């Protein structure tokens, strides 16, 4: 249940049961180096490969959300892809280090994402065409009946997607340093004395839910006396 709205959080087996094994296998056998930003550090690439080991299992699980289907009082629904495998970048502007960072979402740089996103749209179509909703007479206005083939649907997704639902994470990931991590389990930055990071950037991958409550939970663990926060303050 979402505030003032309804939402469904569904795993890939519920969305595309006939294709889930093929999708997971395709990801497992990819050459990830071909789909990461140019100049990606070997440690960061190693981290992506470690995440892939987890993702190939996640994609097959019914209880891990791949689709967040937002249902509200408006005459539309927006399928949100919870676990994209494409990776973007956040960099300092070399011409002005004090300016806003340069952000590249890297959306659909891994072709598997466009395939999964198309599956999400097909699922939403089936949902609104289901017998349960027939009494309400839903009418599809977008993408519309003329968008029928896989190629047409993928092209429509590319033209209409929004690259973010404002859940950015991972720029200071809690991972081992040799996997591209920035902070350890105590949230202290590697190689810097007394500096810790406590925000959404430490989450290595987007959780299958809005990030707000996850960040609250991290902050609570840090702020309570005798917990992680005290250890951070006393570390020399």
Residue positions per predicted region:
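Mid-to-C-terminal "cap/lid" subdomains and adjacent gly/pro-rich loops that border
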Residues: 1-74, 131, 145, 152, ...
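Charged, low-complexity surface segments at secondary-structure and domain boundaries
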Residues: 8-14, 102-109, 136-147
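C-terminal structured subdomain/cap of oxidoreductase catalytic cores
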Residues: 76-132, 157-236
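Active-site-proximal substrate-binding core of FAD-dependent oxidoreductases
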Residues: 135-150, 227-236
């Amino acid at each position: 249940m979402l505030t003032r709205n309804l939402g469904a959080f569904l795993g890939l087996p519920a969305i595309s049961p006939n294709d889930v094994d093929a999708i997971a296998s395709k990801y497992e056998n990819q050459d990830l180096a071909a789909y990461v930003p140019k100049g990606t550090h070997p440690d960061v690439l190693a981290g992506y490969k470690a995440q892939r080991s987890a993702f190939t299992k996640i994609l097959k699980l019914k209880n891990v959300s791949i689709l967040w289907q937002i249902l509200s009082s408006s005459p539309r629904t927006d399928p949100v892809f919870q676990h994209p495998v494409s990776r973007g970048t956040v960099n300092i502007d070399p011409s002005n280090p004090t300016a806003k960072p340069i952000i590249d979402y890297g959306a659909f740089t891994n072709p598997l994402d466009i395939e999964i996103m198309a599956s999400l749209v097909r699922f939403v179509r089936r949902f609104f065409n289901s017998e349960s909703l027939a009494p309400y007479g839903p009418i599809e206005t977008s993408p519309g009946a003329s968008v029928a083939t896989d190629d047409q649907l993928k092209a429509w997704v590319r033209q209409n997607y929004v690259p973010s639902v404002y859940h950015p994470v991972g720029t200071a990931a809690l991972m081992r340093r040799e996997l591209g991590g920035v902070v350890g389990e105590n949230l202290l930055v590697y190689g810097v004395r007394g500096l810790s990071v406590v925000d959404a950037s430490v989450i290595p991958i987007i959780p299958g839910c809005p990030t707000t409550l996850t960040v609250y939970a991290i902050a609570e663990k840090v702020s309570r006396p005798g917990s992680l926060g005290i250890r951070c303050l006393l570390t020399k």
